[in-house]
Amino acid sequence: MQSRPYCVVDVFTAEAYRGNPLAVVVDGSGLDTHQMQEFARWTRLSETVFLLPPTNTEADYQARIFTPAFEVPFAGHPTLGSCRVWLSNGGVPRSADEVIQQCGVGLVRLWRDGARLAFRAPQLQRAAVDEAVLGPVLGALGLARAKLVQAQWLDNGLRWLGLLLDSADTVLALEPDHPALKSLAMVGVIGPRDPRGPPSVVDFCTFEVRAFAAAADVPEDPVTGSLNAALAQWLIQDGLAPDCYVASQGTRLHRAGRVYIESRSGDIWVGGDSVICIAGTVIL
């Protein structure tokens, strides 16, 4: 075991402790998969990232991403958070405006706009949802069929059952049966905000999002980049969302996550602010 630089970064927020925290071991060299998984299980955060030298010559760094239950090939908030930590720890990208991360899905491009980072959404696979799955999921959510607008399987490295609901209020009212969902699917729900509603701090947000991932030992994720990427690719392509919008997530968990979506030249970019809250060392 040795002392390694370590950070906890709050992602999808410009205000510390209001987003989704991410643990980042800045140098994971020499650790095996079992050691990484055990540490991720111990942190109990949605994801823990281990930064490594890239093996692809086009990449600036490599990230291995773990939930408390298993390693994932890609996730959004770890992509933004690990890039922020890499830059803050002296990382120098090959390009002034772009950083390239190597992870399980290959190369992910990140764009820098001042303090904000955005990643280009990886390729999405979509599929129709079978009633044999949809019915039990709606039951586990306590969701009336009339409140559901559309459903899709969405896979960009993580497989989500995406549900478009009739309103943000419906999204926020859900009281899921997490043990039931654990055996069914990871579920992402999104609903539009009513622009005619009373003024609030989320007036500029177009959608409300929630992510239920009990299968990854995360009953509700505070803010989820991979899910927001997949939802944006689906909804924008099908004309169900504008080309640029802001999504709010984490409201029921007393967070204020903000995810910035932009469609540019056929690509979906998913952006957010991040704040390093803890910086020190860990013995691993």
Segments (PLM) and residue ranges:
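Active-site proximal loop and beta-alpha junction motif in alpha/beta enzyme cores
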Residues: 1-74, 80-284
